[in-house]
Amino acid sequence: MQPIWTMRPAETGLAGAARRVLRTKLPPAALLAAAAVTVAAVVAATGWRAAGPAPSAAQLDEWQAMVAQAVEPHALAQLRTLARRGSGDAQAALGIALVDAREPGLRDEGRGWLETAAQADGRTDTPAARRAQLALGKALLLGSGDMPKDYARARTLLGEAAAQGDPAAAYYLGLIYRSGYGVAADPVRAAHWFEIASRADIPAADFMLANAYREGSGVPRDEARALALYRRAAEHELPEAVQTLAMAYRNGELGLRPDADEFHAQWIETAHALKHPVVAP
């Protein structure tokens, strides 16, 4: 037993093994061999820890938000490491976080990761690929930083995502065909894609589909259906829908009777909705 003044906690694990090897009185050759085995074990264990279990979707979302809001160094490093190892989810998260960054270099990096994730080695039906296609398609449709608009490429990317069931991509396809961005305007196709997005409870799609039914654009004119869709979008505090209802009550539109009280109530709600706008899909 060691004297009390020299006693130390028991050394365990690879670090303890390394120290014990160095304290052992062995011939030089044997000592070198033992040290080499120990170092190899340490390297192997370290590599295993670095790979580790894949982070959860919630963790990736948290890192994405941290990078998007403040380019937080630790979150950025984590996503870059995973993206370089081939994680499609990390590539999509990093691309989405950086595509609207202030620094041009970071924006370029973001677009690069979105391009990589959107391809997904040909497996474009993966969730990561759909997220990347949606984000890149939106950026090319609406414009992002110094990225030039490319309506044709946007339509292709959004079409691929929508074909795999992404309702937000369907909404943006509706906008493309409604306004004729890079293609002839097609009210029927626009209404079709708005209908798909509306089924997923996207308020902006409800509003655009309501407009189509109100105007008879691409679908039969149906004010009752339009009113129901406006009301559903207004329940989500979409400012445009609330304002439309207010004007309908004021002017007696959409089959409603003029109602000053409802008009004022909806007008107040419009002001509230403008302060807390619905996040775009």
Question: Over which residues does each language-model region extend?
Answer:
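Short helix-capping/linker turns of helical repeat alpha-solenoids
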Residues: 71, 85-88, 100-102, 120-123, ...
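Alpha-helical tetratricopeptide repeat
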Residues: 55-64, 76, 80, 92, ...
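Structural signature of tandem alpha-helical TPR/SEL1-like repeats
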Residues: 70-74, 104-113, 147-157, 184-193, ...
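N-terminal intrinsically disordered, acidic low-complexity segments at the extreme N-terminus
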Residues: 1-15
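N-terminal leader/linker segments that initiate helical-solenoid repeat arrays
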Residues: 39-96
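Terminal, low-structured helical/coil segments at or just beyond the last alpha-helical repeat
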Residues: 244, 250-281
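Hydrophobic face of amphipathic alpha-helices that form TPR/SEL1-like repeat modules
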Residues: 93-100, 133-142, 172-179, 206-215, ...
